[in-house]
Swiss-Prot record:
This is Cell division topological specificity factor. The keyword Cell cycle applies. The keyword Cell cycle applies. The gene is minE. Prevents the cell division inhibition by proteins MinC and MinD at internal division sites while permitting inhibition at polar sites. This ensures cell division at the proper site by restricting the formation of a division septum at the midpoint of the long axis of the cell. The lineage of its organism: Bacteria, Pseudomonadati, Pseudomonadota, Betaproteobacteria, Neisseriales. Keywords: Cell cycle, Cell division. Belongs to the MinE family.
């Protein structure tokens, strides 16, 4: 690296700096284990609204959990549907 490149070298673009900072923030948030995401109650309510259009299911029959497995976030959704009556 010459003195001229050092003094007048290219500066990083603000978009690149912003992207790098955002990636750091996201990595820090993902590293915080044991915290329940804020969106789960809303997700549960919205799922209930959609499911109620098609089947009669109560909120107690919907279980949503989030955990880490092999370094990946896993969102698990369990819905217990009512038994269908045989005709």
């Amino acid at each position: 690296m010459s003195l001229i490149e050092f003094l007048f070298g290219r500066k990083q673009k603000t978009a690149t700096v912003a992207r790098d900072r955002l990636q750091i923030i996201i990595a820090q948030e993902r590293a915080q284990e044991g915290q329940t995401p804020d969106y789960l109650p809303t997700l549960r309510k919205e799922l209930m609204e959609v499911l109620s259009k098609y089947v009669n299911v109560s909120l107690d029959n919907i279980r949503i959990s989030q955990e880490k497995q092999d370094g990946m976030d896993v969102l698990e959704l369990n819905i217990t549907l009512p038994e269908q009556k045989k005709v």
